[in-house]
Amino acid sequence: MSTATLAAAVSSVRIVARQMPDNSASVVPLVTHCSNCHLRDLCLPCGMAGGDVDRLDSLKFGRRKVLAGQTLYREGDGFQFIYAVRSGTFKSSLMLADGREQVSGFYMAGELMGLDGVAHGAHASSTTALEDAEICTIPYAHFASVAASNSGMQHVVSRLMSREIVREHSLMVLLGSMNAEERLAAFLLNLSQRLKARGYSASEFHLRMSRAEIGSYLGMTLETVSRTFSAFQQQRLLEVDKRHIRITDLDGLTRAFETRVH
């Protein structure tokens, strides 16, 4: 596997009868505009010129609290909004024919959700909060109409679509060509990088997702996930206390992953 493919895999590993999403949580006017939001360098305005960010501020965004376990939208629901995570963690998933849930991604502050609905006007997955969270709701039709006459915002739309393609490609690489230790190492390194970008510790964090959800995302059984965590502890790469993770040798975890891949 090439170094470029490895880098993409680590940086992008970012997951019944249908019902309408639970919209009981209120949507309130957005108090913090994109131009002065502390997440602007990670979220929608990233790379935008000042004038384009001002245009974003003119759009009618809403803010909404989402409780742990609450589903934001379900697979098959009509597409209206894209969502920016302000705080908390979400998982995206889809239902397999045999009734099992397949986790397809995890999202944290500054990341966008709901783009899977752009192509066909309906969401291809469900998204659920893993902890109490807050989001910005962005009416896609309004956003797209403003972007249609603005080259800077058109570039943003293209970047967002490209990011989704890269994420899907990286997941295929992860599932198709890596063993269990490589998959879990890539997952932990990715979380570490994303948390560091948000000002948190790169070496010590609490997993918001269960081991079963990690296994579903990585294509591993719960037992294999547990065994692999134990193997990393024995190699003194990690300390694990339930969902609390401390990477004791970040360079070693990275080197071990790169050595296995090559």
PLM segments and residue spans:
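Alpha-helix/helix-capping structural signal
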Residues: 87, 141-142, 212, 251
